[in-house]
């Protein structure tokens, strides 16, 4: 069940859901707006002949930091990783979903490719998968609204919440945009 604004505030006030820093004005009818940080992870496309999710490719991306009062310029067709300014911590019976802001989507900005779901038990900054689908560069201002988190009450607490180790916790406690760690649990069925 999607959690309403009043229940979001109750969960935050009780410390069950933690957003750090939390700004009460960011609460919407059924979500909380989140802001973009000043750290970005750019792809160095010339370091590898291809991307292989089964292999560790430590030089595939590099971290850059823009000044707090300067925008990051996302060029048409470009894909970079960013992160939320807020760190998010969820209890074992609440999941979340990152959604983009409609106003930014109408400008051609996508905030995530596929990883919009946040498991119960997660704690850390949410990595954004940013794409510019427009024909002009887009300025991304640190501290500006970039998306919104919707929260879902589970029917019961997760038996093995994220971070417990049962299903893996490769991104638990992440700070800033975190590169893919797909090689750590790559699975391929022989067919």
From Swiss-Prot:
One of its GO terms (molecular function) is nucleotide binding. DCTP binds at residues 101-106, 119, 127-129, 148, 162, 174. Pathway: Pyrimidine metabolism; dUMP biosynthesis; dUMP from dCTP: step 1/1. Keywords: Hydrolase, Nucleotide metabolism, Nucleotide-binding. One of its GO terms (biological process) is nucleobase-containing small molecule interconversion. The active site is at 129 (proton donor/acceptor). The keyword Repeat does not apply. Residues 165-191 are annotated as: Disordered. Belongs to the dCTP deaminase family. HAMAP family: dCTP_deaminase. This is dCTP deaminase, dUMP-forming. It comes from Renibacterium salmoninarum (strain ATCC 33209 / DSM 20767 / JCM 11484 / NBRC 15589 / NCIMB 2235).
């Amino acid at each position: 069940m999607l959690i309403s604004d009043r229940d979001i505030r109750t969960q935050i006030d009780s410390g069950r859901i933690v957003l750090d820093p939390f700004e009460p004005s960011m609460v919407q009818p059924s979500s909380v707006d989140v802001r973009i940080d000043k750290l970005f992870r750019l792809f160095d496309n010339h370091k590898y002949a291809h991307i292989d999710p089964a292999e560790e490719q430590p030089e595939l991306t590099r971290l850059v930091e823009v000044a707090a009062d300067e925008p990051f310029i996302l060029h048409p067709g470009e894909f970079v990783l960013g992160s939320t300014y807020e760190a998010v911590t969820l209890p074992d019976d609440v999941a979340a979903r990152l959604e983009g802001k409609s106003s930014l989507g109408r400008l051609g900005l996508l905030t995530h490719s596929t990883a919009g779901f946040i498991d119960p038990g997660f704690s850390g900054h949410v990595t954004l998968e940013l794409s510019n689908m427009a024909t002009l560069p887009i300025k991304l201002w640190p501290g500006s609204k970039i998306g919104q988190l919707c929260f879902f009450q589970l029917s019961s607490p997760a038996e093995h919440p994220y971070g417990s180790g049962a299903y893996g916790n490769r991104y638990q406690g992440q700070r800033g945009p975190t590169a893919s760690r797909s090689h750590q649990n790559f699975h391929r069925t022989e067919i």
